[in-house]
Amino acid sequence: MKKYLVRFVTIDGDYDKEWCYAENSEEAESSILSDRWDVDYIEYVEEL
């Protein structure tokens, strides 16, 4: 597992970020989308 920083924009227009562990960037993006109901779109996913 690798550590990823996922930066996203919420439905309110606020920028937010969360850390997660995943096998790849697509899995990290999916993890955030399933955990957070207020995500409008993902801005970027960065491997740390």
Regions from the language model: what does each represent?
Residues G13-E23:
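A short, exposed loop/beta-hairpin motif centered on an aromatic-Gly-Thr core
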Residues Y4-L5, W19, L48:
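Residue-level detector of intrinsically disordered/flexible regions characterized by low predicted structural confidence
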Residues M1-D14:
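Short aromatic-glycine-(Arg/Gly/Cys) micro-motifs in beta-strand/loop hairpins
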Residues S34-L48:
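Short, mixed-charge low-complexity intrinsically disordered segments
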